[in-house]
Amino acid sequence: MTNTRKTHPLIKIINHSFIDLPTPSNISAWWNFGSLLGLCLAIQILTGLFLAMHYTSDTMTAFSSVTHICRDVNYGWLIRYMHANGASMFFICLFLHVGRGLYYGSYTYFETWNIGVVLLFVVMATAFMGYVLPWGQMSFWGATVITNLLSAIPYIGTTLVEWIWGGFSVDKATLTRFFAFHFVLPFIVAALVMVHLLFLHETGSNNPSGLISDSDKIPFHPYYTIKDILGVLLLIMALMILVLFSPDLLGDPDNYTPANPLNTPPHIKPEWYFLFAYAILRSIPNKLGGVLALVFSILILTLFPLLHVSKQRSMMFRPLSQCMFWFLVADLLTLTWIGGQPVEHPFIIIGQLASMLYFTIILLMLPTVSLIENKLLKW
């Protein structure tokens, strides 16, 4: 008798993706983040759905509806903080997932990588719009500052900004449409994830050595299902520690003040996971230049497959490239720190140097070091 798992039209798709999937035998814990991102997305969609049941997207009532969720709804505070801190966990996993891809050369899977970059953009857009919804001071001013950047686009900029705002400033129309987009985008993310997995399963997973592993594959279940469960437990533990012990650790106190268009907060800054890009934006005195640098700081990921000149795929056996990679990580941490600092000496110059170094490492130093390593290995 044939196994239903292998013959049923729907179940066999799940079987080929999560059960009988041939997987390299040597993939490390760095390969756990795909499933953890899936879990984060599921948590965000579920908690977001319950929040949307009680939230009102009107400038007069948005802030008080969030207060109502936290005070009056059964476990509303838990749902709200799981959603807010779930976003932070989502981005931690995203950055680690992308970092893994860069370190082990996973970007040579061209389609998978590029859809991943698109996913990163869409998730960032979703998170930005979600931050606007509580309608606190930082929500309002963050939305004003970031949407205003589009006015730097020549000729159509101002019209475009007013079109996005639905008026002449961030107001009711803006909040309503941001809520609509924030609700629908995670489902688009889920669809893109399916495409991401589709392309990944065309080639199979990469592995730490960067070598072809077709001769040494093992089934995904039970080996990697059990390994993923460990990651899931650690992620949920970290999230719940954050939610239950210091839920406001990563938030901004200004967001507990209702939005006031007549009063600008002294330091406007986005959530921590955007600070590196915000620092790059601020480091360029020209508005259009800053916007281009901001976009290119993420878009540069699409260039990695083209800039890969090494004869080896992974950095596992390339100590010089490893050095450059960790320089890049340190630089990104520096940018994140600078993004949260006021615009004054010495932070301005540190931000400019760190921004310049970010692009220099990726566009110049990594390829150069790869060529040197090729020569050292007499290849």
UniProtKB/Swiss-Prot annotation:
Residue intervals passing through the bilayer: 33-53, 77-98, 113-133, 178-198, 226-246, 288-308, 320-340, 347-367
Binding site for heme b b566: 97, 196
Single GO biological process annotation from the record: mitochondrial electron transport, ubiquinol to cytochrome c
Record GO terms (molecular function): metal ion binding; ubiquinol-cytochrome-c reductase activity
GO CC list: mitochondrial inner membrane; respiratory chain complex III
Topology within the bilayer: Multi-pass membrane protein
Coiled coil: none
Residue numbers binding a ubiquinone: 201
Subcellular location: Mitochondrion inner membrane
CDD domains per UniProt: cytochrome_b_C (cd00290), Cytochrome_b_N (cd00284)
Keyword Coiled coil: no
The protein's required cofactors: heme b
Residues annotated to bind heme b b562: 83, 182
InterPro entries: Cyt_b/b6_C, Cyt_b/b6_C_sf, Cyt_b/b6_N, Cytb/b6-like_sf, Cytochrome_b, Cytochrome_b_C_euk/bac, Cytochrome_b_N_euk/bac, Di-haem_cyt_TM
Further comment found in the protein's record: Heme 1 (or BL or b562) is low-potential and absorbs at about 562 nm, and heme 2 (or BH or b566) is high-potential and absorbs at about 566 nm.
Biological function: Component of the ubiquinol-cytochrome c reductase complex (complex III or cytochrome b-c1 complex) that is part of the mitochondrial respiratory chain. The b-c1 complex mediates electron transfer from ubiquinol to cytochrome c. Contributes to the generation of a proton gradient across the mitochondrial membrane that is then used for ATP synthesis.
Subunit description: The cytochrome bc1 complex contains 11 subunits: 3 respiratory subunits (MT-CYB, CYC1 and UQCRFS1), 2 core proteins (UQCRC1 and UQCRC2) and 6 low-molecular weight proteins (UQCRH/QCR6, UQCRB/QCR7, UQCRQ/QCR8, UQCR10/QCR9, UQCR11/QCR10 and a cleavage product of UQCRFS1). This cytochrome bc1 complex then forms a dimer.
Name used for this protein in its record: Cytochrome b
Record lineage: Eukaryota, Metazoa, Chordata, Craniata, Vertebrata
